[in-house]
């Protein structure tokens, strides 16, 4: 098994029997103490964030992963039905695998699904940005458009995004799927 020092951000390891994604890994050497690695990880089964200190010589179980391109078709209860772009095989993906990205799933969007060595789904990676239409927001008056505030807006996927005052119903906006933040208005 590899040492924690060979693992990098984005790696997927088996920690306490469950798959975890390394969000950040920092090497620290405090005063008179031994060096250690401070790891911030995300449990891929529960979605919880975990912080742990690994000693420099500690070994970890790195999970061998396979990435495949899939296309989102429709929602079936709490699952998302995806189709393999090469074999056209359909699979059900649980909502927890998508995390916050579930709020921005549009029909026919292409995603990357990360599978573990045993074939189970570890995580789903959405495109960094998606273009969505604003379906509901408060109308802006002339005075509001001159100021630089934000207002809540509901987009076509049902997610709520804070947008600038000049955005109106029917506007198409670009949203960052990692943070859920407004990026820009799309001119069509």
UniProtKB/Swiss-Prot annotation:
GO terms for cellular component: cytoplasm. The keyword Phosphoprotein does not apply. GO terms for biological process: peptide biosynthetic process. It is found in: Cytoplasm. Transmembrane segments: none annotated. Keywords: Cytoplasm, Elongation factor, Protein biosynthesis. InterPro entries: Elong-fact-P_C, NA-bd_OB-fold, Rib_uL2_dom2, Transl_elong_fac_P/YeiP, Transl_elong_KOW-like, Transl_elong_P/YeiP_cen, Transl_elong_P/YeiP_CS, Transl_elongation_fac_P. Pathway: Protein biosynthesis; polypeptide chain elongation. The keyword Cytoplasm applies. One of its GO terms (molecular function) is translation elongation factor activity. It comes from the Bacteria. Gene3D superfamilies: 2.30.30.30, Nucleic acid-binding proteins. It holds the Pfam family EFP_N. Involved in peptide bond synthesis. Stimulates efficient translation and peptide-bond synthesis on native or reconstituted 70S ribosomes in vitro. Probably functions indirectly by altering the affinity of the ribosome for aminoacyl-tRNA, thus increasing their reactivity as acceptors for peptidyl transferase. Belongs to the elongation factor P family. This is Elongation factor P. The lineage of its organism: Bacteria, Pseudomonadati, Chlorobiota, Chlorobiia, Chlorobiales. The gene is efp.
């Amino acid at each position: 098994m590899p040492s924690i020092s060979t693992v990098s951000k984005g790696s997927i390891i088996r920690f306490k029997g469950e798959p975890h994604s390394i969000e950040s890994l920092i090497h620290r050497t405090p005063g008179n103490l031994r060096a250690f690695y401070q790891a911030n990880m995300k449990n891929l089964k529960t979605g919880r964030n975990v912080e742990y200190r690994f000693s420099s010589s500690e070994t970890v179980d790195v999970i061998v992963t396979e990435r495949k391109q899939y296309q989102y078709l429709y929602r079936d209860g709490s699952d998302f039905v995806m189709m393999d772009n090469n074999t056209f095989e359909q699979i059900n993906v649980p909502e927890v695998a998508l995390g916050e990205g579930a709020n921005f799933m549009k029909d026919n969007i292409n995603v990357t699904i990360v599978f573990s060595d045993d074939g189970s789904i570890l995580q789903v990676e959405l495109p960094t940005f998606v273009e969505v239409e604003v379906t509901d927001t408060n109308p802006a008056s002339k005075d509001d458009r001159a100021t630089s505030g934000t207002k809540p807006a509901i987009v076509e996927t049902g997610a709520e995004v804070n947008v600038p005052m000049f955005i109106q119903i029917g506007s198409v906006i670009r949203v960052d799927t990692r943070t859920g933040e407004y990026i820009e208005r799309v001119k069509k």
